[in-house]
Amino acid sequence: MFPMKKSLLLLFFFGPISLSFCDQERGADEEENGGEVTEQEVKRNILSSIVNGINRALSFFG
């Protein structure tokens, strides 16, 4: 039970950090594209941040 709680804690810790990086990348993309962000880019950034958070949590235990 403890390892599961620890992994969830790490996931919730690294998730917001990844999302903040995603927001920074989105801001840079907005500057390049003249302020336009497509729905596809938003979904891609969110999905990549989730995957990065999971990978960081798994690499911590591996």
UniProtKB/Swiss-Prot annotation:
Q: Which Pfam families match?
A: FSAP_sig_propep
Q: In which tissues is it expressed?
A: Expressed by the skin glands.
InterPro entries linked:
Frog_antimicrobial_propeptide (IPR004275)
Q: Where in the cell is it found?
A: Secreted
| Residues spanning the signal sequence | 1-22
Keyword Nucleus annotated: no
Domain of life of the organism encoding this protein: Eukaryota
Q: Name one GO biological process term.
A: innate immune response
Q: Which UniProt keywords apply?
A: Amphibian defense peptide, Antibiotic, Antimicrobial, Cleavage on pair of basic residues, Immunity, Innate immunity, Secreted, Signal
A Gene Ontology term for the protein's cellular component: extracellular region
Q: Which residues form the propeptide?
A: 23-44
* Role noted for this protein: Antimicrobial peptide with activity against Gram-positive bacteria. Has been tested against S.aureus (MIC=37.5 ug/mL), against B.pumilus (MIC=75.0 ug/mL), B.cereus (no activity detected). Does not show activity against Gram-negative bacteria (E.coli, B.dysenteriae, A.calcoaceticus, P.aeruginosa) and fungi (C.albicans). Does not show hemolytic activity against rabbit erythrocytes.
Write out the similarity annotation: Belongs to the frog skin active peptide (FSAP) family. Amolopin subfamily.
Which named protein is this? Amolopin-P1
